[in-house]
Structures are given as C-alpha cells and as structure tokens.
C-alpha cells in the first residue's frame, strides 16, 4: 500500500506547507488517537490511552504541540507534555511510564523552518509500518469529537529531564567514571541542550558545552553532528580529550579526538564491536547499504556476522531484532545498543564510546589503527519531488560502466533520500581520487 504522509522517519516537511500545518497536525493527532483508542479498548475494555509528547527547540514546536494536543483530546486520549527533550527520551519515558504511545515533534538535523512528527509504540520502538498505514487510513475519515465527558486531559510531566538523565547514566558501567576526562559537547542548539552536558558532568567529566543556547531559530545552524567544524575548533581551543556532537533531536552523534580528527559512525561501530568482544561474545552486527566495505572485511576476519540493512535506523533495528543481535549503526552516527535502549540515542552512544576508551586505556585513533576505511565519495543531488532515478537512462548506463571499472575493489550505491528531495550517489574504492572522480561522473548524468 502506497504511503501518503509517512516517510522513513515519520511525517516531515516545511512548516506552513502541507503536511506540516496546524490543521493537518491536529487531524493527525485525532487519527492516531482513534487508532490508539481502538488498540487500548481491545486490551482493556473501558480504558483510555495516554500519550507523551516531546519536542525539540524549533519555534514551530509550540504551534504543532498545541495542534497535536487538540487532536488527541478530541479523540478521547490523555496527553502528557515532556517539553524539549531528545527523541530517545520520549522512547524511554513512554516505556518506563507504561504509556500507550510517544510522539516527537522534530525534524532532526534539518533547518529550523522544517519540522516533523514521529511516533513510538508503548514498547519504545518506532511504530510498525502496519500501524502507520492504519493512521493514514484514519486521516481520510472526517474528524469529529468525543462527548465532552470523554475528552482527553492534558498535563505536564514533572521532571522528564531528570528522569532521562538518570536513565542515561545507568547505561554507563558502575565501575567506571569520567574523572580526568575533558569533553566538549555540542548540543546543536537542540533538544539535548539542558541534558547532555549534565549527564557527562554528573559522571565526573570536565564539560565544555557549545550549541546550548537555543533561540527557536538556530537549531543545527553551523553546529551539531552535521556541522562538525565548530566542535573541532572547540576541542582544539579547549585542549579537550574528546568532542561529542549531537544532532537537533540527539538521536545520533559524531566524535572528535584531541587532535580534531572526526570519527564516523562506521568507525564507532568497529570500536564498539571490539570493545564488546573483550567482555562478551558478539554474534554479529548490522550496518547499512552505506556502511564502509572495510567493516565487512574486518568482521569477516574476526568471525563476526555482518548484515547490511536499508538506510535508516528503523531498518537497522529490524535487522537486529530478527537475528537477536545487539549492535548496529550507520555511518551518519545513528548507533543502536539494544541491551541499553530500544532506539538510537546520541548520549548513550557517547557513553558507550567513552566506556570503551576507559576500559582499554587507548585513544580513538589507537582503537581504529588496525582498520583502513575504503575512501567514499557521497554526492547529494537536489531533484524535484517524486523524481525516479531508476528511469534515467544516462545515469543507469554510467553506473554500469563505473561498476565494471571498479570490479571487486569498490562499489556504487544510488538511492533516494527518505526525508528530502535528494538523490544520493555514493562510490567506494580503494583509491580516494578514483572514488571522487567516478561519483562525479555519475552525478553529472542526473537531469531532472
């Protein structure tokens, strides 16, 4: 069944343009509430669902939060408001408080004038595709309102921030602390601005916080995981041991060492697999179609299974759950530790990296010295919405030619973004100059 509104990470778009309008978001709240009410009454006759709403720091969050509240209330659903908290905080609190669902108002790493809505189930996982389709179907039903005595109530959740801080700290080994470690934390002027610095500080680190003054208009603006130059500069200026940059909703990260070198999600996954192997057996790990070939080669030599999922943390999660594995990640910095959390969490991922450094007594560079990443070139080409690259004859011919030239010493990946009107062209080869040249050849054929 074709989706009308839900993408790979909920409903997302430009604020004020369909579907991110007050009217649509109110109807979305009502539709989701209607579906949740059906589930809830099936489990416990006469009961009513409660949902938790969290948001990042975008100015439009106030408007969309109010619209969701109205829609849920009209459907007879009670609402708890967490205020600005990371996406993974909503997943955790929904599960911990035994709520029916969690809702996040965020567009992650996108600019401030974008926003989005995504849902978590009662278990703290992203909604199943079937449930999202049910909500889409419910959107086609005219909105009404339950009787006045059945309207949903709305209240604030006391100390959502403190509850989540304690949860994050609980994932760090009891026998370790961060005393003697100087950390720069870039919060992207986003949802973790009042949380991440305190987590690391309470574990003993000396913390320098940047990107922690949200205005409603500056989320991800020259800061955060997608703009690491600010972090690199701050790490060097403060002579820090490590830098950690989160994105706007704090579900992913990048790390920088004392020299200013940036470490990718692929390198972090390699570090974490090796660290886990030092304390327990590791059956396998999950990457994506974009994961560097070097990991595949290294894991094979280590006797560890490796599977590529489609790009998107929800698909990495599905592949892990299917196999009963615990560790997965994307090069963009989405990391999954299923023995720690049900979803990607930038703060918890940082704590796992820090625990590996503490446990080994080594630096990031030392922990990755035995793996040489294949050079990758990724080019994003802006296209019109709905553009189908698979019907572009020139691109397909050039792709086939490049693959023939690479043979077994590289690969080509072309895919459409699930959240933006972009075609991503990636070429991986043992030679960086070759990868760059071939990626540009393919990208040049894109006519839209």
UniProtKB/Swiss-Prot annotation:
EC number, UniProt record: 5.4.2.10
Residues holding Mg(2+): 108, 247, 249, 251
Active site residues according to the UniProt entry: 108 (phosphoserine intermediate)
Cofactor list: Mg(2+)
A cellular component annotation (GO) from this entry: cytosol
Broadest EC class assigned to this enzyme: isomerase
Keyword field contains Acyltransferase: no
Cofactor note: Binds 1 Mg(2+) ion per subunit.
Residues carrying Phosphoserine: 108
Highest taxon of the lineage: Bacteria
Pfam families linked to this entry: PGM_PMM_I, PGM_PMM_II, PGM_PMM_III, PGM_PMM_IV
UniProt-listed Gene3D superfamilies: Alpha-D-Glucose-1,6-Bisphosphate, subunit A, domain 3, Alpha-D-phosphohexomutase, C-terminal domain
Catalytic activity reported: alpha-D-glucosamine 1-phosphate = D-glucosamine 6-phosphate
Record's comment on post-translational modification: Activated by phosphorylation.
InterPro entries in the cross-refs: A-D-PHexomutase_a/b/a-I (IPR005844), A-D-PHexomutase_a/b/a-I/II/III (IPR016055), A-D-PHexomutase_a/b/a-II (IPR005845), A-D-PHexomutase_a/b/a-III (IPR005846), A-D-PHexomutase_C (IPR005843), A-D-PHexomutase_C_sf (IPR036900), A-D-PHexomutase_CS (IPR016066), Alpha-D-phosphohexomutase_SF (IPR005841)
One example GO MF annotation: magnesium ion binding
PROSITE patterns: PGM_PMM
Alphabetic keyword roster: Isomerase, Magnesium, Metal-binding, Phosphoprotein
GO BP terms, alphabetized: carbohydrate metabolic process; peptidoglycan biosynthetic process; UDP-N-acetylglucosamine biosynthetic process
Family recorded in the similarity comment: Belongs to the phosphohexose mutase family.
Known role: Catalyzes the conversion of glucosamine-6-phosphate to glucosamine-1-phosphate.
Name of the molecule in the record: Phosphoglucosamine mutase
Source lineage: Bacteria, Pseudomonadati, Pseudomonadota, Betaproteobacteria, Burkholderiales
